[in-house]
Amino acid sequence: MSEQLVFRAIADPTRRSIMAMLSGGERSLNDITAQYEMTRPAVTKHLKILEQGGLIRVRAQGRQRLHALQPGALKTVSDWVSFFDQFWDEKLANLKQTVEMDDD
């Protein structure tokens, strides 16, 4: 899975909303479409982008295709955010040290 595909997938608020819905468990296309004021093909396009990003998986159950969050797929995003957490933690620690030295 490409990092670019993951970030592209989560860039859209509708896709983030679909992911939040899927955090409650598997849903069919009909269940997902019923929650949005958009056409079935539009929802299908969003789901395809999420699947390409590795954020959801699809499985067949009879005639239905059930969509579910893919465990661990957000690790790419988490790792990216963690890098910047460490960066800012270091910058803030340096600022604190500078301020404390100025107080002396």
Describe each model-derived feature in a short phrase.
Residues 47-48:
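Short, hydrophobic-biased segments on the C-terminal half of alpha helices
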Residues 51-62, 66-68:
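Beta-hairpin "wing" of winged helix-turn-helix
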Residues 2-41, 65-79:
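N-terminal helix-turn-helix DNA-binding core of bacterial DNA-binding proteins
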Residues 26, 51, 100:
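Acidic-residue sensor for enzyme active/binding pockets
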Residues 8, 20, 51, 57, ...:
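A cross-family signal for key residues in well-ordered alpha-helices
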Residues 1-2, 75-104:
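Amphipathic alpha-helical dimerization/coiled-coil segments
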